[in-house]
Swiss-Prot record:
Annotated source species: Methanospirillum hungatei JF-1 (strain ATCC 27890 / DSM 864 / NBRC 100397 / JF-1)
Taxonomic classification: Archaea, Methanobacteriati, Methanobacteriota, Stenosarchaea group, Methanomicrobia
Keyword match Chaperone: no
Subunit relationships: Part of the 30S ribosomal subunit.
Stretch forming the signal peptide: none
Keywords, ordered alphabetically: Ribonucleoprotein, Ribosomal protein
Gene name, Swiss-Prot/TrEMBL: rps8e
Protein name: Small ribosomal subunit protein eS8
Amino acid sequence: MQWQGRSVRKSTGGRYSPSRGKRRREIGSAPAETHIGIDRRKISRTYGGNNKVRALRCEYAAISNAKTGETKKVKIETVEENAANPNYVRRNLLTRGAIIRTELGRARITSRPGQHGVINAVLIE
């Protein structure tokens, strides 16, 4: 868990005098870091008492073909590119914008697996 409030330091290096301490609502959560594997999800309580489904491992993606308008459930083979971080390719981490190789071909992930709990993608080729 990480505190995500305003920094104690100014841009000049001086300190702000805080009017109050840190609050629990300002704490963020660790990234889900979704891998390729047998489906595993985690439900976490969020602000307002709602639930958020985090995908920890995913085996399949819902791939949409823009030309035909069809959507199919397809097995993910590997991660080919990831603009977020080059190390994510080596670790096979699934994030939004990552290019994955599937049985149908290459696809770009459009959903946020760590926030939505599912993987939706659009076919590139």
